């Protein structure tokens, strides 16, 4: 007899198998017990028929408690009524680990309670579906960039150089000097691009933002590619192909998790249609002003959540907003060739109210200009001498971008809050568990 995972049930219809599971819920009548089971690969139902098993087995099926771990042995059958499509007719049950008074009962619980018990809430069907999709997006990320000829270059987490200033950085001591937890691997990826052409990093980043919005985490994961000999328009093409690839990979490989979440796949299919619209910051301001909904919006300010939502919904798919004012963007962006007041950059805004999921730009290549911008940003040039060296020794046009994984997961899954998109969210008021 074979031991299998639930996800492999379709390959063993009408076969007797053994599966290691946890009990998520149960109900029973006088003659039949229905056990909702999970094993980390999928969820399905176990059916225990009183007349088909021993008295001890049926009694155990009725008494076993939520989240008890079990080995169940039985025959796999098709179950067209369920999302999963299969169930097991149980013949034997073996208790592996008891579970008494499991705190997360099937009733409704508040957000704070579930966050306090996040280590257990991860076992829920909804969290299972979200993490399956997150995992698929990570897998697809590596696949996409490997196919495109990128190599992964790991950027340090501890750094003495800040890409966007130090006001939102976590400070620590590095023996006898200051250091910070990284808020971006971009500067190091630029060094990698000058060595290897096309590189990307994927790792945790930290922002000490005192923000409580549904879009912000203190610790999150970023995908940051950098490309040598590449201008902004070529970078935009890679960005949209990458995002469409993520969406298509989820559609192809996560039908079951999407069904669990009730995500509209027809909407997701629309996001695979390229190219995505492109508008300038100037045009975005004009659209907002003409809408009559944003009387206070004016040129020179960054967009907030309502403005980003309106712009993306206007196009019903991801949209690039290009060439933002220089004053509201970081020092490393390349100035526009015909305008002193804007830089060559773009944010990708996701529809359905999710806002910015990518920020990118063509990078400045003139070392004198960069040094001036570093000083204007209130940073110490000595900390960036290595970065300026990249312009002094064989500089080339190069571009890059960063995609926040959790924002993208939240968007693709259709969840309301970014805290659901990471296993253990770090929020302004939460660092436990």
Curated annotation (Swiss-Prot):
What cellular-component terms does GO give this entry?
cytoplasm
Q: Which Gene3D superfamilies match?
A: Bira Bifunctional Protein, Domain 2, Nucleic acid-binding proteins
Coiled coil spans? none
Q: Which reaction does it catalyse?
A: tRNA(Asn) + L-asparagine + ATP = L-asparaginyl-tRNA(Asn) + AMP + diphosphate + H(+)
Give the UniProt record's GO annotations in the biological process aspect.
asparaginyl-tRNA aminoacylation
Query: What's its top-level EC category?
Result: ligase
Its domain of life reads Bacteria
Task: Fetch the InterPro entries from UniProt.
Answer: Aa-tRNA-synt_II (IPR004364), aa-tRNA-synth_II (IPR006195), aa-tRNA-synth_II/BPL/LPL (IPR045864), Asn-tRNA-ligase (IPR004522), Asp/Asn-tRNA-synth_IIb (IPR002312), NA-bd_OB-fold (IPR012340), NA-bd_OB_tRNA (IPR004365)
**Keyword Aminoacyl-tRNA synthetase annotated:** yes
Where located?
Answer: Cytoplasm
Pfam families reported for this sequence? tRNA-synt_2, tRNA_anti-codon
Give the UniProt keywords, A-Z.
Answer: Aminoacyl-tRNA synthetase, ATP-binding, Cytoplasm, Ligase, Nucleotide-binding, Protein biosynthesis
| Molecular function terms from GO | asparagine-tRNA ligase activity; ATP binding; catalytic activity, acting on a protein; nucleic acid binding; transferase activity
List the EC numbers from the record: 6.1.1.22
Q: Which CDD domains match?
A: AsxRS_core
Q: Which family does it belong to?
A: Belongs to the class-II aminoacyl-tRNA synthetase family.
What is said about its interaction partners and assembly?
A: Homodimer.
Q: What is this protein called?
A: Asparagine--tRNA ligase
The scientific name of the source species is Ligilactobacillus salivarius (strain UCC118)
